[in-house]
Amino acid sequence: MDKKTVRKYRIIIFLLILIIIGGSYAWLRTVIYGKKDVQITVGDFDLVLSEPSDGINLVNSLPVYDEEGKTNTPYQFSLENRSDIDLYYTLSLVDDEEAIAGCDTSSGSSCELLDPRDVRYEITMGDRTFTGSLSDSSIIDYGVIESRETVKGELKVWLNINTGNEAMGKVFLGRLKVFATQQVDDFNFEQGNDNVNKPEMDSNMIAVKHDGYNWVKTDIDNGWYNYDMGIWANAITVKADKLSEYQAAPIGTEINMDDIETMWVWIPRYSYTIAGDGTTYYGKRGAYLNSEPTAALPGEIDVKFVGNDVKERGTAKYSDTDEPSNWYTPDAFTFGDTELSGIWIGKFETSSSNPSADYGGGNTTELDALIKPNVTSWRYINVSNIYQVGLKISASGNRYGFSTNMNSHAMRNDEWGAVAYLSQSRYGKLGNVNFTGTDKEIYQNKSDNFITGCSYGSPSNGNTDYGCQYQYDNNIRTEDGVTGKGVGASTTGTIYGVYDMSGGAWDYVMGNYNDMAASSGFSEPLTLDSKYYNKYTNSDASLACNGRECLSYSLSETSGWYNDYHNMVSETYPWLLRGGRYYSSTGAGVFGFNSASELGGPGSNCSFRLVMSPSL
């Protein structure tokens, strides 16, 4: 099959109407009406959705924890592929505009809509079960239905335990929508979420998900993450005097943001390759870009998740007329002599234990690192002190409770690259179907107060209306035609990604030219263990790794993507910065890099990020 001429059809099937009504006598009233044996035939497609006549009828229900909600009677349906071709589909629960338009209250006024954050669900399709909130994404399931296959599904819904009194009298009206295409190699789910290496956590770390209102403790074995849906695994650490309390708490317990000290995102080990025409390599158009890839609007980076026994060393390039090949496993997943199953990335730019201090911390190692949203990032600190602050997190007697099972450190440049490449894959914002065109680029943080997690609500640009236009959790539900203004600043376009990788402050990374210390505070030449920094031997990014291209470092491979800065380190400016700052124009972005005019010394616009490498 010619992948360039694959036919795609948008199929909307009114198989489910979901009504949730809050009232003084009934917190939750849910009735799901299905249309029995709905069949849609378009060209080679022949899909049949079958469902029993009885639906769910929940009356006089109260907001409940997930454990209780999962005991509700399921609504059952099936999806049958009667055609001779395999189909890839995504199943979304979206607003039923027709039902909303016809909805009136007993007084005759239009119905007020219930916030999607108030609706929790569990969906089972075949042998897959996933629990989530309608605020996570409108997509509730995805997959491949093989030719002549029937997949049975079950859906349970309940009211979020955190629903407040303001929900009284409001309604939610929804319908299921199916998007389907002929199955091609672009949708190889054998390389998807099932192959993700399970996050390696220390005993002090708590797995979390966002319920639409707050971060809550989650079950590590049931729906914690789903990389196919842009839900990357998140974990936190809390204050020492709160740890035992949260460890003993039930699944679904809200984590008070004041108790959180660090937040982390798991980047699983993967291999990648980049498509091109033999001269330029801007990624592939694939299923997620509506134009041919260019430097200004690059395409998809092919990614496949691999075990830590796999270390591929191909060219990381292939012709876009062929199947993906020449895979390369990023150097970020090697720490010294250890091959890692993944790495934990600080979710936000680093802040300090005294964010009200000058520059959010200043040039000292006396403060401790925090990683959380809505605080001032730690700036005006030289690279030597950044290095020491990174080591402190997992050092003996640290305040966070980390053991020797973890190795904390300042982010290397290749580790930045690992996050950037995953964001440009189908598992990151590039693959998030709620964003199209130029909105595929990670939104810029234009906060002139350097507040972590902020979003301008659009990619980097020359606008000078600085500030924190949207906080990181703004509009966490994205619907057709409406982009998530806050979550668009994350690497996934969901709340589960990494923030502050475009704008905010420049981020120092441990990338250096020929061991030159300059103003960093290190002695010269550098005597650091090589596992803590990347050494570059040439100011030409295509020759910087001992005369060769630095594959996986997001340097020459992705130079100028999204028109981001691309200035390499040199003898004059030996230390590397990433991401851009709040007042950078179009040059700010996840692929942006620059040689630091501060020479590794303190800068009022320079912050840093932290990484945790498991050594279990």
Put a short name on every predicted segment.
Residues 254-261, 291-501, 614:
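Short aromatic-cysteine micro-motif
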Residues 185-325:
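N-terminal module-boundary/linker segments of secreted carbohydrate-active enzymes
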Residues 3-4, 61-67, 125-152, 156-158:
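Extracellular adhesion/glycan-binding regions together with long Ser/Thr-
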Residues 414-417, 438, 444, 448-466, ...:
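C-terminal, surface-exposed recognition/capping segments
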Residues 71-88, 92-98, 139-184:
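C-terminal, structured domain-capping segment
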Residues 19-20, 29, 67-128:
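Surface-exposed interaction patch
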Residues 74-76, 171-175, 205, 259-269, ...:
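Extracellular structured ligand-interaction cores
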Residues 2-67, 170-172, 177-184:
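Short, polar/proline-rich extracytoplasmic segments that appear immediately after membrane translocation
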